[in-house]
Amino acid sequence: MVERRKIRTEKGLALVPGANKLSGGCNFAVEVPEGSQASLVLYKKRSRKPFVEIPFTQEERIGNMYALSIPDFQPEAYEYNFMVDGKVYIDPCAYRILGREKFGAAVDADIHKVRCGFLRNEAFDWEGDKEPSIPYHEMILYKLHVRGYTKTNRTVTGTKGTFQALEEMIPYWKELGINTIELMPAYEFMESGTCRDAEKEEMVSEKRTEGRVNFWGYIPGYYFAPKRSYCATDDPEKEFKTLIKKLHQAGIACIMEMYFPKECNMLVVLRALQFWKLYYHVDGFHLLGEGVPTEILMHDAILSNTRLMFHDFN
């Protein structure tokens, strides 16, 4: 492992959680419980072991946020995790989760196998994409589970149970008169193995669920990352964008169902919805759980024309 002192770092911006390219470098920020210690772990791509572990200093902490920046960082060459009090902690604001490509796979003994990737932000031709203008009272909504809907469908010729497979269903939905698709949780969540324990409200814990798989995803999730095991390709960003573009070309809107338990940071909830709207062109959200900050969302300028559905929605 490379010595920490050989990696030049600067004080980061705590306002932006996760890993984000900012002003010539990469900013890493993570929320931790009061009194906890944290560090950043970097991996070279295709390397099983950590490349370097960089402890956060007290100077890089404000409140319960740690933040540091690495100048001239090349994210395409690395992957990362955080460590909190000596335990690997997957960034809840990561744009990509690696190591969970197979749905329902048992947790690996290697604690460094599951790790975070960076937003590629590669050029994508939206072909003048426009969201379908469908009033609430005219919505004919079809709710589905990305994996379950096409996994046993004999008419699907591509990789079943994926975003790509849903593209093949568009003519069928058009025939039915469907104009809105609602996706059950399609962001990353740990359906088996070690996960964050929402019931105990711990930042980092190990809750073993051997032999059990949470098929539906109504648990704390990684709200910025399309679920990797729902992808036919190794590029979740492009695959999900392509699905949205083709839905819109057919005049079909896409609403994402998202579950936020009560311990969710309300600003992370807001930022997650803004991200899916701006980056993926999602048309709306069906929000579940006790952590939905309805007043904040309803008054947000970016989401002002976005379809928002939640408990007591009127």
Locations of regions flagged by a protein language model:
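Aromatic- and acidic-residue-enriched carbohydrate-binding clefts of CAZyme catalytic domains
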Residues: 155-162, 193-249, 260-280
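Active-site-proximal helices and loops of the catalytic beta/alpha 8
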Residues: 54, 218, 272, 278-314
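Conserved, mostly hydrophobic/aromatic
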Residues: 30, 144, 183, 223, ...
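Short proline/glycine-enriched turn/loop motifs at strand-loop junctions of beta-rich domains
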Residues: 31-37
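Catalytic domains of carbohydrate-active enzymes, especially glycoside hydrolases
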Residues: 168-186
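Hydrophobic faces of well-ordered beta-strands that scaffold small-molecule active sites
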Residues: 140-142, 181-183, 254-256, 285, ...
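The feature marks proteins involved in alpha-glucan
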Residues: 1-23, 53, 60-145, 150-157, ...
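Structural beta-strand segments of beta-rich domains
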Residues: 24-28
